[in-house]
Amino acid sequence: MSLPGLELTQPSAESQSASAPPTQINLSAGSEWRFEVAFGTTVRVKLLTGTAELFGTELAPSQTYTFSGTKAAIYTWHGCTLEVSAGDAVSGLDGTTSASGRGGLGAGGCQSEYIAEETPMVEYANVHFALEGLRAEAKASGRDGPRVLILGPEDAGKTSLSKILTAYAVKVGREPIVVNLDPTEGMLSVPGTVSATAFRAMLDVEEGWGSSPMSGPSAVPVKLPLVYFYPIVNPLEAEGSVFRPIVSRLALSVMGRMAEDEDAKETGIIVDTPGILSQSRAGALEMINHIVTEFSITTILVIGSERLYSLMMKSYDNKPSSSASSAASDERISVVKLSKSGGCVDRDAAFMKAVRESQIRTYFFGNPVPTTASSALSISSSSTTNVTLSPHAQQLDFDAIALYNYTTSSAEEDQNDEDDYDPAQLTTDSFLPGNNEAESASSLPGLNSAANASAAAAAGALVPLKKVPGPAPSALANTLLAITHASPTSSPSEIRDASTMGFLYVADVDSERGKIRVLAPVGGRVPSRAIIWGKKWPAEVVGLVG
């Protein structure tokens, strides 16, 4: 269409929406292609020739992979050729494509992409082979396999290294147990959780760790995570009084799995940690020591911090491990320094917010990004499909649920928090076990019932967890609720230490009628269990439903 007087032609809608032709990228042996894709856009990658891997998981030849909201790198040991093209736009939580979701100027619409010749992959591979040697020794002597702790500052590549070591272990037939202690990102779960999973099958190239059991199809075998809810962004909050016992419960479950599963025992565990533990904060070193002790760590990998490496060397190198099976063999801790990859980039607050929203949306609605799941469903291998889930909506009487909320907060939040910490509310008999009756609490040897009741009340007061009274607070809207395995009348410590059954999303709150409308991943009545409110973390997720 011509513009009058200017003799210029306005581009048609078809020409504007036409995507650029695919770009071929040739990688030499030992190099990697680093790329960043914004949320709201997709980039398709196909391996044409050679071999390549993404965080240790090999790409299948001639298979199209779709990425969105990703910062990653594809590495090749022997050289390869990739085909990169722009994919379709993906709507956000509100059904629209955000301005930040426009494609970039790189190949296929990537925000940033380049080829790097210098990578730490040889170091990481050497770590894998060293761990394999330790696993072989453990099998021969009947001991537990290596227990690996990964430390480093924020955005140093700790999770990427965890994926690489896990993928390499699975590739040689091992069964590593991976532990995620970072509540800012969920592993096979939503943000605000810590979890552990035994990996028997390959990781998902497009979705990272893969997916937990769901009612929809999956191209990669699903994993079964053990999840604990920690709705606080800082593990050191309240001097670690909440995070520390959760770590202990998770470690107890992991060690129990290793005792019963011979494959997991021989392979060992890999523990990923939050970057805040590597900062010079009060309580950080104590928390690291707690993790080392509870998981009987034998190998500490430090990435991107000379100060932390020096501190770990002084504190742990060549010191005896706390493993029960190491008493006879005198197993000792090794501290190893690894190089930080040049591909590690800072993830700003806006990107991390989008990551959290994407994980929560995927939990309830499935993945909106077209994936390769169609090939697993015997559909045309050249096509892709969306894995769409339909959550079940239902109304709940607020007075009929046992909703609890953590009252720990930073000094800044204390000034504006309507739920200020009140120890008096934590010492009421409503937190005592046995249907709110102090008399039904189990007796302690050598103590009378009055002393036992006082001890139980004092123990409950130490846990910053209180029951949310009616009417239903409006702040519940657009937040997550975690259904625990604890009964509604359990003590605060029992609720804190209970693992999670699943999550609800509060779509609407009617305070006048005392009802809330929630989304659940499965149908049926909500179990009568203690429910924990994710008020402060992962906080509000607006626009999940219309």
Curated annotation (Swiss-Prot):
> Its domain of life?
Eukaryota
What residues form the membrane-spanning segments? none
Q: Name the SUPFAM superfamilies for this protein.
A: P-loop containing nucleoside triphosphate hydrolases
Chief place of localization: nucleus
Residues holding ATP: 32, 71, 155-160
Q: Which GO terms describe its cellular component?
A: mRNA cleavage factor complex; nucleus
Sorted alphabetically, the Gene Ontology BP terms of this entry are: mRNA 3'-end processing; tRNA splicing, via endonucleolytic cleavage and ligation
Name any one Pfam family assigned in the record: CLP1_P
Sorted alphabetically, the keyword list is: ATP-binding, mRNA processing, Nucleotide-binding, Nucleus
Where is the sequence biased in composition, kind Low complexity? Answer: 9-24
Subcellular localization is given as: Nucleus
Family stated for the protein in its record: Belongs to the Clp1 family. Clp1 subfamily.
How does the annotation summarize its subunit structure? Component of a pre-mRNA cleavage factor complex. Interacts directly with PCF11.
Protein name as annotated: mRNA cleavage and polyadenylation factor clp1
Which organism is this entry from? Emericella nidulans (strain FGSC A4 / ATCC 38163 / CBS 112.46 / NRRL 194 / M139)
The gene from which this protein is expressed is clp1
